[in-house]
Structures are given as structure tokens and as C-alpha cells.
Amino acid sequence: MGAVRHKGFIPWDDDADVMMLRKDYDRFLSVLPSELPNYLFAQTQKNEKDSHFPFTKLRINDTLLSTEFTSRFPNIHNGIFLDVLAQDYTSNNAFLRKIHMKATASSRWLVRDKWRGTSVNANSRFSSLCANILRKIFPLGFLQKVQNKLISLHKNMKNPKYLFDSMGRNVSRGAFPAEWLDEAIWVDFENAKLPIPKEYDKYLKYLYGDYMEMIPVSERHVSHDIKQIDLGEYAGYVCKDSF
């Protein structure tokens, strides 16, 4: 939306994500050990036991961006970050698709709230009760394995027609046609050219409705509860004409 509506960063948005198809995401993870520059750290569930994000965070070494939540975990890397997420396939059958996405979303909420030490607040009292019983019974490691299995359950599916935001905040928004992400076009973003889906209009309407309508000033908030920030050697950095 930033690229289309603002031709760059959304002024009040403090977050930037990169999304990939599952096959590209898995390949990305496979080349990280040999290709990642020394000034970056790839934070995953595998290399930091206290980190349970379902996606990968690329963090800048010798910087700090501590939020209200992550400040509770001093042993994890809390550098300035960029999130890298996969878009996963789901069933072509409408009923099975609904079950898969509901189960995936539920497993993610269980992991999140188990990690945070908070109660699950579901759509109904009964659902909340069941979820919190599961949260108390099962260890975090087990819940995380279930979550990861559900996220990529259909990764080897033949002729998939639907994708969903398996790792991101739109996991409960439902599936969308996989063909929307088949092709990319290059658009202006600040002083650079970056790729976005050719069917960006359909994708953005699926996410936001009338995405060209500006939200009220009163609703323009950052998405992170930042407690402390240190840009390190980048404190005096000025953006160049191109990336």
C-alpha cells in the first residue's frame, strides 16, 4: 500500500515486511548461512530458543529496537529488524480450506499467548476456555511444532489455487487466489524501483477495502510499543538517491 498510495513509506507506519511464496522462503532460509552479510543477524526459532516468531526477522547487529514485549527477553537479539514472511498454500476445497486456516490461526494465538504469558481471548467463552486449557496443558515447544506444521501443511500440494497469510497479521482474513501473486511489476518506492504483485489492486482490496482512502489522523498510529531505540553507527545515516 505504501508503494501504490504513497510512492514510498507510509509516514506513520514503523514497520516493513517482505513476503515470499513458500518455495522462495525455504530457499531464502537455505542460503542465509552462506550469503548473509556480517552486519545482519537472521533471527529464527531455531537459532534463538526464546524467540517464537513464526517468521524470520533480519536484525541489524549493534542496534537496538526494544518493544514493550521483547524487552522482557533480554537474551534475544533486539536489533532493528525487517520481517520476512511466507505466503502459504491452503486447500482447494472450501470446507477444508476453512478448517485449515482456522486451525492455523488458533495454533498461532496459542503460541503467542503461551509465550506472552497471557490468556487466549477467542470469539466465544467456550472457545476461550478450550484454548486456555490447551495453553496450560501443552508446553510451548509442542504448540510451536503444531503451528509450524499447520502453516506449511500444503507446501507440496499439486495445482494449488489459494494462498493465505500464514505467518502474518492477516491470517484470519481468509484465502485469496494464488494467481494474484503469479506476476510482479516494478514500481517507484521512494528513490528506488521495487517489485509488487501485478494484481496489486485485487490484493489490496482484499486486505483493506478502499485502500486509497486515507484513514483519519486520529487512527494513524505506529504498530510497535517502542521502549528503547539505538541506531548505533546508523544514527547519522542519510538515505541515498537509490538503494
Describe these PLM feature segments.
Residues K102:
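Short, His- and charge-rich active-site/binding loops that engage polyanionic ligands
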Residues M1-A16, M20-L29, P33, E179, ...:
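Active-site nucleotide-donor binding segment shared across nucleotidyl transfer reactions
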